[in-house]
C-alpha cells in the first residue's frame, strides 16, 4: 500500500491538509511533524477515518506537542528523554485507538540539537558514547513495545548524515543508524525493524563512501516499510522519483514484495503526485 506524508503539502493546519488530500482523492496518509499543534487532532482524524475512509500511519513527531523539541529516544538529557518517550506513548495510544498499523520513529542521535538544525548544519557538540545511547534507546524502545496493540508494528528510521555534518564533527558520526552496519550492530541489542528512507540512505552512503545499491538491498531484506524520495546524494532534498533513476530501479526490483511505501516529496503538488503514480504502477 502507498501512503503520502502530510509533509508533502505546505499546508500546516491538520484539517486543511487532510481536506486537500480528500480533494485529490488520496486517502492513505502518513501523519508527521510538519503539522502545527492541534488540540482536537483525535476528533479530526476520527472524522476523516469514519466519514471518508482515510487510512493513517504515524511518523515520529505526531501528535504535535505545544512546544517544539527534538525527539530523541536515546538522549542522556532526562528532561528531553521523558518528553520523547511521552510523545511516542501518545502516538502509540492514537495508533491503538484508531487501529493504525504502523508507527515509525527516528533512530537516536549521539548529540542533542535544536529543531532549527534538523535537516541542516548541526553545530558541533560533544558526541555521547554510542554504547550508552544505545542502552538508553533499548530501554525506551522496549518500554514502547509494551504499550502497542498486537497488530501495531514499530519501526526505526535510518538517519541522514550529510558530508557537511560529518566534516563539522571532524569525521565522527553524531548519528545512529546511517548504514546497514549500524543496523546490524544495533539489532544485536534491540529487536526492531527499520523504516528504510531512500533519501536518507542515498546521502549517508555518499558521505560514508558506501555502495548505495548494496546498502539498499541489505536493508530491504529486513523491512516491509520504505519511505520514498530522491536527491543529488549531497543533501536530503526530498525530490520526486523519476522513471529510470537508480531509486526507481531499486524499488522496481521489490515489486513482488508486499511493502508499504510512504512518499515524502516536497515542492509542487505534481512532484508527489508523479511519484505516487510511479509507485501505483510498480505495485499493481
What kind of region is each of these model predictions?
Residues 6-9, 34, 81, 170-174, ...:
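Short, flexible loop segments at the rims of nucleotide/cofactor-binding pockets, characterized by
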Residues 48-61, 140-147, 180-189, 248-254:
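Alpha-helix-loop-beta-strand connector modules within alpha/beta enzyme cores
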Residues 52-54, 101, 150-152, 256-259:
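A short helix->loop->beta-strand "cap" motif at the edges of active sites that frequently abuts
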Amino acid at each position: 500500500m502507498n501512503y503520502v506524508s502530510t509533509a508533502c503539502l505546505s499546508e500546516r493546519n491538520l484539517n486543511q491538509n487532510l481536506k486537500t488530500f480528500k480533494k485529490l482523492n488520496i486517502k492513505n496518509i502518513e501523519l508527521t511533524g510538519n503539522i502545527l499543534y492541534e488540540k482536537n487532532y483525535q476528533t479530526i482524524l476520527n472524522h476523516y477515518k469514519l466519514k471518508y475512509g482515510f487510512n493513517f500511519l504515524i511518523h515520529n513527531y505526531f501528535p504535535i506537542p505545544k512546544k517544539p523539541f527534538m525527539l530523541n529516544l536515546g538522549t542522556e538529557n532526562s528532561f528531553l528523554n521523558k518528553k520523547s518517550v511521552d510523545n511516542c506513548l501518545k502516538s502509540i495510544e492514537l495508533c491503538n485507538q484508531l487501529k493504525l498499523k504502523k508507527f515509525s520513529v527516528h533512530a537516536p542521535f549521539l548529540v542533542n540539537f535544536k529543531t532549527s538544525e534538523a535537516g541542516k548544519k548541526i553545530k558541533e557538540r560533544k558526541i555521547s558514547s554510542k554504547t550508552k545511547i544505545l542502552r538508553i534507546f533499548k530501554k525506551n524502545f522496549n518500554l514502547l513495545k509494551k504499550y502497542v496493540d498486537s497488530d501495531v508494528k514499530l519501526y526505526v528510521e535510518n538517519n541522514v548524515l550529510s558530508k557537511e555534518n560529518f566534516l563539522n564533527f571532524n569525521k565522527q558520526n553524531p548519528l545512529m543508524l546511517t548504514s546497514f552496519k549500524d543496523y546490524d550492530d544495533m539489532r544485536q541489542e534491540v529487536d526492531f525493524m527499520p523504516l528504510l528512507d531512500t533519501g536518507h540512505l542515498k546521502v549517508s552512503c555518499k558521505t560514508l563512501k558506501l555502495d548505495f545499491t548494496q546498502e539498499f538491498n541489505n536493508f530491504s531484506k529486513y523491512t516491509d516499510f520504505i519511505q520514498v524520495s530522491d536527491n543529488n546524494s549531497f543533501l536530503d532534498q526530498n525530490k520526486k522519483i523519476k522513471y529510470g533513476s537508480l531509486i526507481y530501479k531499486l524499488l522496481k526490483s521489490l515489486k513482488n514484495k508486499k511493502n508499504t511505501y510512504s512518499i515524502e516529496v516536497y515542492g509542487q503538488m505534481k512532484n508527489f503526485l508523479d511519484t505516487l503514480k510511479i509507485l501505483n504502477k510498480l505495485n499493481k
